[in-house]
């Protein structure tokens, strides 16, 4: 946006403030100045009046003008098409330096002497207004013959071009910029112009009826005006030209000017275009307008079935007034910018920049200010007749109240700001401020035109803007890192700890897709995801469902490594698996295939994996566990005779098994062992310190004949039920059979580790303990001491 110091002065008096200071202030308050320069009409350019204008006798495109410059008359040859007698013009006299390359001198043009030059605005360094000379009028001030042009404020000015961020639509107007500067300098801001006194006794109700359908988000104000022959004042033309808004239509230029100054979005409709259809020869006098939502859900203006405009977005060009005497309907509108932006983005309708740009960033919601300014300009400068009254559709917009405590506000800012100063600064920006009963809290309501204020951080930013960032004392940043160890972090660290232990145990980590092939899973006996919740659009047919197990992918990786020539293959993976109902679980799986130790001394043939050796390595990762015999269910990967549940803390947390011979053959692998564990059961826990006994630990071995179908886990469970605290551990030591032992029995040696926490056990006490165990085994399992 481009403005000049003289354009701002009517709203806030900046005459006494140096231009360089204004430049710095604009940057300080967030209205970044893109460019800044002073523009002054050259010396020896004065106000003149064309008294006579005749065609040059020897040139079709030249005119010979007699120009009065006050003390004398000058003859000037001019080639402008629009020059005519009676015009007030800018005259460059002899010696005037118009540019670095042009100095005015007496000259003869086609034999006729010319004593100066009648100038256009662009020739004097100002924006281009038309194709001819610049015609002066009283809008720049009282015209006096011979008065230097640079003595008029409009032609000796300071030009600012500022960059307005998208959230500061309130500063897309002269009112907005003036309001900001008034707050920064603690100056009075001139309110909106007084309402124009209507001079037409006919009220708006005789010419226009306005209605609406349903609940609206927009506020609208309508006014009717009788236009006469319009003429655009020079001051308005120059103001618009600075911002590249000057167009061909005089009325549209007046509207653009009112919008630029006030920030109110304004449209004009031909009254004739809004009249209802008539079946008689008599033309109706009363136009009818309906506001309702269109097919895209955007609030629009209709006259009957004809759409006049979409509020804040576009206008039907057929409804735009011509620069001719007629009755015109003026419309000022406001819609909250978020509603406009979301509606246009959703419907993808075509938009006109001159409406949408301002509406989507936030136009001025005080509609009377724009309409009053426009009507005043049309009446005073264009001779228009203003009809009395208005039609208004007003919404009750209520800005949210933001509660801020002064301590937090000072913390945001970085230094203590007195309460009175905070209140004063906010009120200068037109905020409403209420103090709480304890004076430590402020209830703040931003003005409607500040749609960018939502929270206390925004309030702090407003205060810093006006205080000036340079006034905030610089000090070292103090911060203390907060403890960020939460459950998720602890779980993550636990999982990575398990992974590190697995790598120390010789397993390599792998990562696979969470997808697998449904037909292949069913082939190996796994329950797949129910069709109702399965993937609708799988990547490929080989990845058409979510995996219920990690083992198939791990076995595929084992095959790939074997084909690459590796003989020692030990892999693990942590990842998601899914139940039939598509509930996510987290699992940990291991696989070991081929040799455990390479074929080098002292293992010339290498060392093969065994189920117990595999279990021992897994125990080094997840901690000690016991095994409980498990018959394979639907899974076809597990060996029926070497398959067990993994028991930890009395709960089944997974399965360990040797690969079924048929599966081993199908995958073309050596002896392979697999395990899959519910990772959610391996919850992290703090190490619990426990006391230990200082007294000797003794071993006692019991060899019994017992039925071979009794699992050792059942024996262990029953012995623990005895509650003998001196038995610290028990485990199977040896199994023996020969022809002398019944084929339904085995010779089982159980080792007991016995220790007291309070004394050294006597032999009689040890014998008593072992006897209790023997009695239990005999009574519950029919075991006999061998």
Curated annotation (Swiss-Prot):
EC number, UniProt record: 6.1.1.20
Gene3D superfamilies the UniProt entry points to: 3.30.56.10, Bira Bifunctional Protein, Domain 2, Ferrodoxin-fold anticodon-binding domain, Nucleic acid-binding proteins
Subcellular location: Cytoplasm
Pfam families, per the entry: B5, FDX-ACB, tRNA_bind, tRNA_synthFbeta
Entry binding sites for Mg(2+): 452, 458, 461-462
Domain of life: Bacteria
Domain FDX-ACB: 693-786
Cofactor(s) required, per the database record: Mg(2+)
Gene Ontology cellular-component terms listed: phenylalanine-tRNA ligase complex
The keyword Aminoacyl-tRNA synthetase is assigned to this record: yes
Catalytic activity: tRNA(Phe) + L-phenylalanine + ATP = L-phenylalanyl-tRNA(Phe) + AMP + diphosphate + H(+)
Residue span, tRNA-binding domain: 39-150
Keyword tRNA-binding found: yes
GO BP, sorted A to Z: phenylalanyl-tRNA aminoacylation
Residues making up the signal peptide according to the UniProt record: none
Note accompanying the cofactor annotation: Binds 2 magnesium ions per tetramer.
PANTHER family (UniProt xref): PHENYLALANINE--TRNA LIGASE BETA SUBUNIT, PHENYLALANYL-TRNA SYNTHETASE BETA CHAIN AND LEUCINE-RICH REPEAT-CONTAINING PROTEIN 47
Name of this protein: Phenylalanine--tRNA ligase beta subunit
Organism: Wolinella succinogenes (strain ATCC 29543 / DSM 1740 / CCUG 13145 / JCM 31913 / LMG 7466 / NCTC 11488 / FDC 602W)
């Amino acid at each position: 946006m481009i403005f000049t110091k003289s354009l701002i002065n009517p709203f806030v008096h900046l005459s006494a403030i140096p231009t360089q200071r204004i430049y710095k202030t604009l940057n300080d308050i967030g209205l970044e100045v893109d460019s800044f320069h002073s523009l002054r009409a050259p010396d020896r350019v004065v106000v003149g009046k064309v008294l006579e204008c005749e065609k040059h006798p020897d040139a079709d495109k030249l005119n010979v003008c007699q120009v009065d410059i006050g003390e004398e008359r000058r003859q000037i040859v001019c080639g402008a098409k629009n020059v005519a007698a009676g015009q007030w013009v800018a005259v460059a006299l002899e010696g005037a330096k118009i540019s670095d390359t042009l100095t005015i001198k007496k000259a003869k043009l086609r034999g006729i002497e010319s004593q100066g030059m009648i100038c256009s605005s662009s020739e004097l360094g100002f924006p281009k207004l038309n194709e001819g000379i610049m015609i002066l009028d009283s809008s720049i001030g009282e015209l006096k013959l011979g008065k230097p042009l640079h003595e008029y404020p409009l032609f000796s000015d300071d030009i600012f071009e500022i960059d307005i961020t998208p959230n500061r639509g309130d500063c897309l107007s002269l009112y907005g910029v003036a309001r900001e500067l008034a707050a920064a300098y603690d100056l009075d801001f001139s309110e909106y112009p007084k309402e124009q006194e209507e001079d037409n006794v006919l009220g708006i109700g005789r010419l226009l009826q306005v209605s609406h359908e349903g609940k609206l988000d927009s506020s609208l104000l309508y006014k009717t005006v009788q236009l006469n022959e319009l003429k655009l004042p020079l001051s308005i033309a120059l103001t618009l030209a600075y911002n590249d808004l000057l167009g061909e239509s005089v009325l549209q230029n007046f509207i653009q000017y009112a919008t630029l100054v006030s920030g109110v979005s304004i449209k004009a409709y031909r009254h004739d275009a809004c009249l209802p259809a008539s079946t008689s020869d008599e033309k109706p006098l009363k136009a009818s307008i309906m506001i309702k939502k269109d097919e895209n859900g955007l609030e629009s203006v209709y006259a009957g079935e004809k759409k006049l405009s979409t509020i804040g977005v576009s206008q039907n060009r057929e409804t735009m007034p011509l620069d001719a005497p007629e009755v015109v309907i003026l419309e000022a509108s406001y819609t909250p910018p978020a509603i406009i932006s979301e509606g246009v983005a959703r419907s993808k309708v075509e938009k006109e920049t001159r409406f949408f740009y301002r509406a989507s960033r936030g136009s001025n919601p005080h509609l009377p200010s724009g309409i009053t300014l426009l009507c005043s300009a049309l009446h005073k400068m264009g001779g228009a007749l203003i009809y009395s009254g208005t039609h208004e559709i007003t919404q009750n917009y209520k800005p949210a109240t933001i509660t801020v405590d002064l301590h937090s506000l000072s913390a945001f800012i970085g230094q203590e700001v007195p309460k009175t100063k905070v209140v004063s600064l906010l009120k200068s920006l037109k905020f409403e401020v209420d103090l709480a009963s304890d004076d430590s809290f402020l209830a703040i309501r931003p003005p409607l035109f500040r749609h960018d204020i939502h929270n206390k951080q925004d309030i702090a930013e407003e205060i810093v803007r006006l205080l000036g960032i340079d006034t905030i004392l610089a000090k070292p940043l103090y911060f203390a890192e907060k403890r960020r160890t939460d459950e998720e972090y602890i779980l993550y660290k636990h999982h990575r700890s398990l992974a590190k232990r697995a790598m120390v145990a010789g397993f390599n980590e792998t990562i696979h897709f969470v997808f697998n092939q449904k037909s292949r899973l069913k082939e190996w006996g796994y329950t797949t995801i129910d069709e109702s919740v399965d993937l609708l659009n799988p990547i490929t047919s080989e990845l058409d469902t979510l995996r219920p197990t990690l083992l198939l992918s791990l076995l595929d990786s084992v095959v790939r490594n074997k084909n690459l020539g590796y003989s020692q293959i030990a892999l693990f993976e942590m990842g998601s698996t899914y139940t039939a109902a598509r509930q996510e679980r987290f699992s940990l799986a291991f696989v070991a295939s081929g040799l455990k130790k390479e074929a080098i001394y002292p293992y010339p043939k290498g060392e093969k994996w065994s189920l117990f050796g595999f279990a021992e390595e897994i125990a080094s990762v997840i901690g000690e566990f016991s095994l409980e015999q498990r018959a394979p269910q639907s899974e076809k990967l597990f060996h029926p005779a070497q398959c067990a549940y993994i028991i930890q803390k009395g709960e089944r947390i997974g399965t360990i098994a040797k690969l079924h011979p048929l599966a081993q053959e199908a995958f073309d692998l050596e002896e392979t062992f697999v395990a899959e564990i519910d990772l959610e059961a391996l919850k992290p826990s703090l190490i619990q310190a426990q006391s230990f006994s200082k007294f000797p630990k003794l071993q006692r071995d019991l060899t019994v004949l017992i039925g071979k179908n009794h699992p050792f886990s059942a024996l262990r469970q029953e012995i623990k039920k005895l509650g003998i605290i001196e038995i610290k551990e028990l485990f199977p030591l040896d199994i023996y059979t020969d022809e002398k032992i019944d084929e339904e029995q085995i010779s089982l040696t159980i080792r007991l580790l016995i220790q007291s926490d309070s004394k050294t056990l006597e032999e009689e006490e040890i014998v008593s303990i072992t006897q209790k165990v023997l009695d239990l085994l005999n009574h519950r399992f029919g075991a006999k001491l061998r």
